[in-house]
Amino acid sequence: MKTDYEFLKTDIDGHILTVTINRPERMNALHPPAHAEFDEVWNEFDKDENLWVGIVTGEGDRAFSAGNDLKFQAEAGGKMDINMASSGFAGLTSRFNLTKPLIAAVNGVSMGGGFEIALACDLIVASTNAKFALPEPKVGLAALAGGMQRLPRQIGMKNALGMMLTGRHVSAEEGKSLGFVNEVVEPENLLSAAKAWAKQIEECSPMSIRATKQVAYENFNEPDLEKSMKAHYSAVKELFGLSLIHISEPTRLSLI
């Protein structure tokens, strides 16, 4: 994977990829060139068999991401491209076929599209100074990058509407209470805490993890348990269809 991105920083530690939004002067808000870089990064992450877990965070402690770069939009004459890459905001929010787990390490502001990036991840680790919101209705917009769909699925309709209809800011601790934050840590411990989660995942079979994620997501809204358990899943078929397995460490399976 290349490392010379203009608006992102990438780091690889073992099987873990960390992607940092590197626009602190814009509160890590995203504009079209940043979206394009994200799309490229996640494409590479998806196809690289040596990368098993991803972490996304923001440079500095002020913001994970303030969402859409409204200043850039104003400078461009007010045009807003809602038809970005098919993979969505940050190349992620409409990327529904990614079976590798992603962790959002949220530092500071996570607003609008920034919150939607975090919601598109599988786990959220937040610093004590993190603030979450979908404030689009306050400025006559709507959370079009999956926020209106993902938040009710993750915390229930009443809790989600309580956030979405008011645009109110939610602290990391309240986010944990509501159920969309997995862990709250001090700002100086944020990245190490996210990496600790990633390391635990890394200790598992990557193919088992992918199968688990696929089944969990594809059956989230399936009310028929029997139908869910009898369904066919490509990642499960791949996992149990192996003809040659090498056990290199306890509980870890890898292809030869």
Model-predicted segments: where are they?
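CoA-thioester-processing core
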Residues: 89-99, 105, 111-165, 193, ...
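Conserved CoA-thioester-binding segment of acyl-CoA-metabolizing enzymes
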Residues: 1-61, 243
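Well-ordered beta-strand positions
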Residues: 123, 162, 166-168, 174, ...
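Glycine- (often His-adjacent) and acidic-residue-rich active-site loop
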Residues: 2, 58-97, 139-140, 220-223
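Short, active-site-adjacent cap segments at secondary-structure transitions
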Residues: 61-65, 111, 133, 216
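Single conserved hydrophobic/aromatic residue that forms the stacking wall/gate
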Residues: 245-256
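C-terminal long alpha-helix characteristic of the crotonase
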Residues: 125-130, 181-230, 243
